[in-house]
């Protein structure tokens, strides 16, 4: 807002106001003849935040005549002063009402468009914070529940893999045992065949022994029959060999020989069977120990593979959990950074608004001080005017009074309405013409 005072004719006051769309201006000029000598005072204009402009009263020069005494009718002069004071007080009251109206409008605007309103530039989401916290808690619990379910699925999958590996290992072990059993069956078949061969040989030898015994008995019977015949041969020879004894001896020799052969065959069979049995026992023990060792090694390998798979699965699960945790932390960090940025922006806006309110408060304090100073000056002028009137009343004589020529004071107040871009929308001129006994008020509208 700019305030300009210019003089035209006797004294003209003009006030130019610029605001968001409303302007208020008031000016007053008063010229009181006969008080002081060339004394003048001017009450300047001021600006209020929110589009309020006040142009204070411009009190014109109180001029006195060359004798320094009041001339004319003192009652009319005091009445003019009272009228001007009443007009000034009315202007002050009107400005106070306008100021209160603008303050109410500003308050309504802040309530409607300020922070905390639904249409404001800075929304207040404080009522949504409990809902957001509840939803965040539900999301965290659901995330933890999902992580627990995923962990249980991983554990179940690992358990299934372990059981599958155990089944495969047991199946391989079963197949290996079946193969060993089949091998042992082949060995058993070979041993059975060998035993059968030995039994056949034993039967053959037994049959041969029986056949030899039978032949021996037949020969013995034949010899006995031949010896027991009715042939009587008498010879005068030397006594011969006793055939019975000879046959008995031969039978004894053959029996001893057969027994010896049987013993030798049995000893040979026992020897061969013992070595074979020992070899079979050694081979069976070595096979059993090797099979046991192989089984232990397979079990150890299976256990190590299961542990390796479980460790790999645990590593994968921990890596997934770490990745998910890092992602969650990154998301939370980004949200916190966004909240920090929003809070910093809000803090900057609050500081800016605080600075603006501080400046407005300082301007209002300056306006208040200026108005108080103007009121004090006006009161001091009124007090001086009353003293001058009393002095003039005591010293005045009918012969020394001079007739004062009528004087005219013209006050022009220019009120302009501007848009936010500074363009003049409309302009009005208030003209106040005052005489010693008559006041004419005119209003002229100037098109923009």
From Swiss-Prot:
Stored InterPro entries: IF_rod_dom (IPR039008), Keratin_I (IPR002957)
Keyword RNA-binding tagged: no
Annotated stretches, region: Coil 2: 247-385
Region Disordered, residue ranges: 427-448
Region (Linker 12): 224-246
Keywords on record: Coiled coil, Cytoplasm, Intermediate filament, Keratin
Region (Head): 1-73
This protein's GO CC annotations: cytoplasm; intermediate filament
Sequence segments annotated as region (Tail): 386-448
Principal location: cytoplasm
Pfam family, one: Filament
Compartments reported by the entry: Cytoplasm
Domain IF rod: 74-389
UniProt subunit comment: Heterotetramer of two type I and two type II keratins. Interacts with KRT6A to form filaments.
Protein name: Keratin, type I cytoskeletal 27
Organism of origin: Mus musculus (Mouse)
Lineage start: Eukaryota, Metazoa, Chordata, Craniata, Vertebrata
């Amino acid at each position: 807002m700019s305030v300009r005072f210019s003089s035209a004719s006797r004294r003209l006051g003009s006030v130019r106001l610029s605001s968001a769309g409303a302007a208020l201006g008031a000016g007053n000029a008063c010229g009181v003849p006969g008080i002081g000598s060339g004394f003048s005072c001017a009450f300047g204009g001021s600006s209020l935040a929110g589009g309020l402009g006040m142009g204070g009263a411009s009190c014109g020069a109180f001029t006195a005549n060359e004798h320094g005494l009041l001339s004319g009718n003192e009652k009319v002069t005091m009445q003019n002063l009272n009228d001007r004071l009443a007009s000034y007080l009315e202007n002050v009251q009107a400005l106070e009402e306008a100021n209160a109206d603008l303050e109410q409008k500003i308050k309504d605007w802040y309530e409607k468009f300020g922070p905390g309103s639904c249409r404001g530039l800075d929304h207040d989401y404080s009522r949504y914070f409990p809902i957001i916290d509840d939803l965040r808690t539900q999301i965290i619990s659901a995330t933890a529940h999902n992580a627990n379910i995923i962990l249980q699925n991983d554990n179940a999958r690992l358990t299934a893999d372990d059981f599958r590996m155990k089944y495969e290992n047991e199946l391989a072990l079963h197949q290996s045992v079946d193969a060993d059993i089949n091998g042992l069956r082949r060995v058993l078949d070979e041993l059975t065949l060998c035993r059968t061969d030995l039994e056949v040989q034993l039967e053959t030898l037994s049959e041969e022994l029986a056949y030899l015994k039978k032949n021996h008995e037949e020969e013995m019977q034949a010899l006995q029959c031949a010896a027991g015949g009715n042939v009587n041969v008498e010879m005068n020879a030397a006594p011969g060999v006793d055939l019975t004894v000879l046959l008995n001896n031969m039978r004894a020799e053959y029996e001893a020989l057969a027994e010896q052969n049987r013993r030798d065959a049995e000893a040979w069979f026992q020897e061969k069977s013992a070595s074979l049995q020992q070899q079979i026992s050694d081979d069976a023990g070595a096979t059993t120990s090797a099979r046991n060792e192989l089984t232990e090694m397979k079990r150890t390998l299976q256990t190590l593979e299961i542990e390796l798979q479980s460790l790999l699965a645990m590593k994968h699960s921990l890596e997934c959990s770490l990745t998910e945790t890092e992602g969650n932390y990154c998301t939370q960090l980004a949200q916190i950074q966004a909240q920090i940025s929003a809070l910093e922006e809000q803090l900057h806006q609050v500081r800016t608004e605080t600075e603006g309110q501080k400046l407005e408060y300082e301007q209002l304090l300056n306006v208040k001080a200026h108005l108080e100073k103007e009121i004090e000056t006006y009161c001091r002028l009124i007090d001086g005017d009353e003293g001058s009137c009393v002095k003039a009343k005591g010293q005045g004589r009918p012969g020394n009074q001079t007739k004062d020529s009528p004087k005219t004071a013209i006050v022009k107040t220019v009120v302009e309405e501007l848009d936010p871009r500074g363009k003049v929308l409309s302009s009005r001129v208030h003209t106040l013409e005052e005489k010693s006994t008559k006041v004419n008020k005119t209003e002229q509208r100037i098109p923009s």
